[in-house]
């Protein structure tokens, strides 16, 4: 069989593989950054995506605060509120505030990638504005937690814990700040539920469609000294810079 015949057959096989979907292209750099927000990133607890961590923390804070609000043991109230505050504002343990900010940062990384779609470029700055109310509630929870830590009165501690629980619930579901009957109807009322919806809408608008990114790409994206992001072919794990 001639060399030319082998080449023709090889090209035919390759074309068939492409047509059948057996050969896939690597995801865009922009979509990998989106994947860090939505799916997985190698530096978080359980390597979960930043948005997933934020959602988990939001629920944990609510549960701890609700428990503290009905407890009658002051030391236990303080212990539970301290844990709720840590799950809210701690950077080292990926609290809610830190995790949602990092989710937004990675959507911004996606938007500034050379291969970002117009959709992602337009959505990133809006999402950065959308997270503001959640961050503000986190700050308030931190301040209320300090008051719980210093009080010597059980009833006061319970009342403060109830306020924290209310803010924590709003960080999950949103709030109706203007009394129009709509919870989370505008960015100033958003919680994690609305933020998840905004990112889902962004993903739905992507063309070509966004596909869930494999961990091979999610965990091996590195940033070069010139600021460019590339895949590490040696799979040594992503550069920590820009990931925390």
Q: Model regions: which residues?
A:
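Mature extracytoplasmic or organellar-lumen-exposed domains after removal of signal/transit peptides
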Residues: 25-244
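C-terminal motif of bacterial Sec signal peptides marking the signal peptidase cleavage site
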Residues: 18-21
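Non-globular terminal segments
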Residues: 6, 23-24
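Bacterial N-terminal signal peptides that target proteins for export
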Residues: 2-11
């Amino acid at each position: 069989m001639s060399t030319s015949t082998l080449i023709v057959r090889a090209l035919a096989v390759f074309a068939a593989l492409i047509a059948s979907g057996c050969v896939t292209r690597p995801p865009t750099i922009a979509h990998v950054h989106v994947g860090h927000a939505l799916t997985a990133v190698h530096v978080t607890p359980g390597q979960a995506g930043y948005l997933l961590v934020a959602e988990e923390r939001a629920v944990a804070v609510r549960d701890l605060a609700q428990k503290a609000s009905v407890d009658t043991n002051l030391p236990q109230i303080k212990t539970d509120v301290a844990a709720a505050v840590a799950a809210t504002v701690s950077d080292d343990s990926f609290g809610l505030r830190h995790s949602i900010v990092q989710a937004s940062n990675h959507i911004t990384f996606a938007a500034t990638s050379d291969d970002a779609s117009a959709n992602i470029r337009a959505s990133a700055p809006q999402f950065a504005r959308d997270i503001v109310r959640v961050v503000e509630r986190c700050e308030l929870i931190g301040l209320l937690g300090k008051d719980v830590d210093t009080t010597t009165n059980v009833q006061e501690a319970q009342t403060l814990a109830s306020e924290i629980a209310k803010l924590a619930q709003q960080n999950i579901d949103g709030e109706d700040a203007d009394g129009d009957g709509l919870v989370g109807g505008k960015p100033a009322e958003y919680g994690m539920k609305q933020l998840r919806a905004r990112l889902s809408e962004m993903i739905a608008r992507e063309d070509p469609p966004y596909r869930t990114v494999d961990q091979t790409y999610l965990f091996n994206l590195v940033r070069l000294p010139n600021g460019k992001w590339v895949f590490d072919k040696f799979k040594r794990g992503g550069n920590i810079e820009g990931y925390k």
